[in-house]
Amino acid sequence: MRASRPVVHPVEAPPPAALAVAAAAVAVEAGVGAGGGAAAHGGENAQPRGVRMKDPPGAPGTPGGLGLRLVQAFFAAAALAVMASTDDFPSVSAFCYLVAAAILQCLWSLSLAVVDIYALLVKRSLRNPQAVCIFTIGDGITGTLTLGAACASAGITVLIGNDLNICANNHCASFETATAMAFISWFALAPSCVLNFWSMASR
């Protein structure tokens, strides 16, 4: 007796892992095809993704920036201490101006040093436009005051020492040292001001 045989033979189902791989391959092919079509229709209108650049050395929130702030504060405090150690500086307006500018410079630099330390501890980048603008304006103001006070004190020191020749009755060495410290503080401030201005202008 002849028995009929089935026309369709059963096929074992593929394992789930093979199904997942096949589905992923189909999805990738579909995505590539869609992307190619979009690129063909979009042409040159597609914008490249932005690349975030690293902060330059000396920028706010970097070890270099913290070092500059500490140097600024140190020499401003040194200028203040040396000038305040003399008992006759209040009689000269330029020296009083230097003391006031040194106090402002020291407070400003120490405040930004604290901000840099916080940014380094939490590993944040100080790229906020408002913060960079405040840093730039503050550096510009304190830098102008410090440079003006140092130049005025240098002029008075030269007048006392070279023109009037009365250093025997004054603390010319202390005046010269305080003036030099103020200039060094300003030179340390200049890179911070330039970097902040460049960062603000490049946005």
Curated annotation (Swiss-Prot):
Ranges in the topological domain labelled Extracellular: 85-94, 161-177
GO CC terms, sorted: membrane; plasma membrane
Membrane spanning stretches: 64-84, 95-115, 140-160, 178-198
Subcellular location per the Swiss-Prot or TrEMBL entry: Cell membrane
Membrane topology reported for the UniProt record: Multi-pass membrane protein
Keyword annotations: Cell membrane, Membrane, Transmembrane, Transmembrane helix
Record text on subunit structure and interactions: Homodimer and heterodimers.
Segments on the Cytoplasmic face: 1-63, 116-139, 199-203
Matching Pfam families: CASP_dom
Signal peptide range: none
InterPro entries hit by this protein: CASP_dom, CASPL-5
Name used for this protein in its record: CASP-like protein 5A2
Region named Disordered: 39-58
Coiled coil (residue ranges): none
Protein family: Belongs to the Casparian strip membrane proteins (CASP) family.
